[in-house]
Amino acid sequence: MKHYEVLFIVKPTLQDDEVKTKVDFVKEVITKNGGEIAAVVEMGTRKLAYKIDKYERGVYFVIYFTAPTKLIAELVRNLRINEDIIRFLTIKYENKKEISAWEKLSHGVKLSENMKKNERKAPKEPVKKDEEENKESEEEITSEE
């Protein structure tokens, strides 16, 4: 199986649940045709370089996956039919250097997702220092002068 990346832009006028449905649709096309998804990246809403079908912005997504070659034709066909996807680009990673870059990218996405899940929230109140620590640091500053 070969390594691929598909970037697609969804219309910005869609609601969040409709956008999620479009992403799930693309993921389903990949998995139904024998592909394995490594990572999905939501890049968010961004300004387009030029207007596409009267839109100046779009919601960007990138999916890293491995798949047999025949899947790409089916994926492209489905992306062209879907009117809510205004642009797409499929990239094939061929040589060892490109494949290692693909692995780093897809692995890096997984790591950043795990880090977001494991992040601790900041305390609501600031942590107070003891008055003694403040006095000691002031004494050190005055002694250095």
Swiss-Prot record:
One Pfam family in the UniProt entry: Ribosomal_S6
Bias-annotated ranges (Acidic residues): 133-145
Keyword Disulfide bond annotated: no
Region entry Disordered, spans: 113-145
Membrane spanning stretches: none
Any one of the GO CC terms: cytosolic small ribosomal subunit
GO biological process, one term: translation
Sequence ranges of Basic and acidic residues compositional bias: 113-132
Keywords, ordered alphabetically: Ribonucleoprotein, Ribosomal protein, RNA-binding, rRNA-binding
Residue ranges the record marks as coiled coil: none
One MF annotation (Gene Ontology) recorded for this entry: structural constituent of ribosome
Entry similarity comment: Belongs to the bacterial ribosomal protein bS6 family.
Function recorded in the entry: Binds together with bS18 to 16S ribosomal RNA.
Protein name: Small ribosomal subunit protein bS6
Organism field: Campylobacter hominis (strain ATCC BAA-381 / DSM 21671 / CCUG 45161 / LMG 19568 / NCTC 13146 / CH001A)
